[in-house]
């Protein structure tokens, strides 16, 4: 549920577009949608833990149904709450043509009619049906509701889709919605205007982002932490939280403390890059050498070879290889410590290069 930090001051509306949640259909529990606080700046925009939200996606059971002249109203329950969903009826203004259609047109019309029947079957909702709904959050007469843009009935006889949703949402909440929005660009601007405004965690994130930019711009393949610590632009940023005024008699002590603090903040910044898969270590990091994921051509070649070989097997020929299968094979043949983040970075790069494609979510096949 929504943490207490959601009560803090709203982010200025000009900065909402920097938060990717703002433009996405947020997968929230209905109970949290009912508790969202509406923006004081722009009506129709709501906040969850500082994230601006205007559109959501829900999955639940229909427990109520009302029909009006212009719309259907469905009560949807996901176990955390019940929300009203407004589905507008489509107006059928197409006038029938009096001219006799040609054979090709007749065949096309027949196909379109079948498609329309399928759509009507999927969108004919009754009480007890499982539905997936996307739409805009709205408040009408002080009651929270969803103005639906797309919806369909979910065929889920053995509850696979519902179980997958139950497993997916806690992870999304933990990684996205419950994390306060932090923009590296904004933190960088704040650091230059007022260095004291950043706490150590914010400065570490900013240093991590700047280090990533440095590695990408210079196409660095491998590096030691000490090599980053002597980069002037990074060092000046890392110095900010540990610069203190000191008398002559305390100079050596402060210098030692500052040196340790700088080493620590660089270590934590690199650890953030490791967690996201931008860099990694081999052989348990025994030699303390870091490899840049996007520059390790040998790793790319091995991952591509795994997908290429396994996609020729009958059980992977149709859908391709699942992410977890690729990860398991890579840990056997490449490195037992290969992280999901590193593999995700490699897969995205291979997909950008058109070496592989994503057939469905989390499934990949190679050419």
Curated annotation (Swiss-Prot):
Region entry Winged helix-turn-helix (wHTH) 1, spans: 190-294, 295-367
GO cellular component: chromosome, telomeric region; CST complex; nucleus
Gene Ontology MF terms in the entry: single-stranded telomeric DNA binding
Swiss-Prot/TrEMBL keywords: Chromosome, DNA-binding, Nucleus, Telomere
Subcellular location: Nucleus; Chromosome, Telomere
Record's keyword annotation contains DNA-binding: yes
Assembly description: Component of the CST complex, composed of TEN1, CTC1 and STN1. Interacts with TEN1 and CTC1; the interaction is direct. Interacts with ACD/TPP1.
Job description of the protein: Component of the CST complex, a complex that binds to single-stranded DNA and is required to protect telomeres from DNA degradation. The CST complex binds single-stranded DNA with high affinity in a sequence-independent manner, while isolated subunits bind DNA with low affinity by themselves. In addition to telomere protection, the CST complex has probably a more general role in DNA metabolism at non-telomeric sites.
Similarity remark: Belongs to the STN1 family.
Family annotation (PANTHER family): CST COMPLEX SUBUNIT STN1, REPLICATION PROTEIN A-RELATED
Protein name (database record): CST complex subunit STN1
């Amino acid at each position: 549920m929504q943490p207490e930090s959601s009560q803090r001051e709203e982010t200025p509306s000009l900065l909402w577009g920097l938060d990717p949640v703002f433009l996405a259909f947020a997968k929230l529990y209905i109970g949290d949608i009912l508790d969202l606080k509406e923006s004081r700046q722009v009506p129709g925009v709501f906040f969850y833990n500082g994230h601006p939200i205007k559109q959501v996606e829900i999955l639940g059971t229909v427990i109520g149904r009302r029909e009006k002249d212009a719309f259907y109203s469905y009560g949807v329950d996901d176990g955390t709450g019940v929300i009203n969903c407004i589905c507008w009826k489509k107006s059928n203004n197409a006038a029938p043509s009096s001219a006799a259609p040609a054979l090709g047109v007749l065949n096309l019309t027949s196909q379109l009619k079948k498609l329309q029947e399928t759509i009507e079957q999927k969108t004919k909702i009754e009480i007890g049906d499982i539905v997936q709904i996307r739409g805009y959050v709205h408040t009408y007469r002080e009651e929270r509701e969803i103005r639906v843009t797309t919806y369909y009935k979910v065929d889920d006889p053995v509850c696979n889709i519902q179980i997958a949703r139950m497993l997916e949402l806690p992870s999304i909440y933990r990684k996205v919605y419950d994390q306060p929005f932090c923009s590296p660009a904004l933190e960088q601007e704040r650091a230059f205007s007022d260095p004291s405004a950043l706490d150590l965690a914010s400065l570490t994130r900013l240093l991590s982002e700047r280090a990533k930019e440095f590695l990408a711009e210079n196409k660095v393949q491998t590096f030691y932490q000490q090599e980053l610590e002597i980069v002037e632009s990074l060092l000046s940023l890392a110095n900010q939280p540990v610069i203190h005024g000191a008398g002559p008699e305390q100079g050596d002590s402060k210098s030692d403390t500052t040196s340790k603090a700088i080493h620590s903040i660089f270590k934590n910044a690199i650890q953030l890059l490791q967690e996201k898969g931008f860099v990694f270590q081999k052989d348990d990091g025994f030699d303390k050498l870091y490899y840049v994921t996007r520059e390790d051509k040998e790793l790319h070649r091995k991952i591509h070879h795994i997908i290429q070989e396994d996609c020729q097997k009958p059980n992977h020929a149709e859908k391709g290889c699942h992410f977890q299968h690729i990860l398991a094979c890579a840990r056997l043949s490449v490195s037992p410590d290969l992280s999901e983040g590193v593999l995700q970075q490699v897969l995205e790069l291979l997909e950008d290069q058109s070496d592989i494609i994503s057939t469905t979510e989390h499934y990949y096949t190679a050419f």
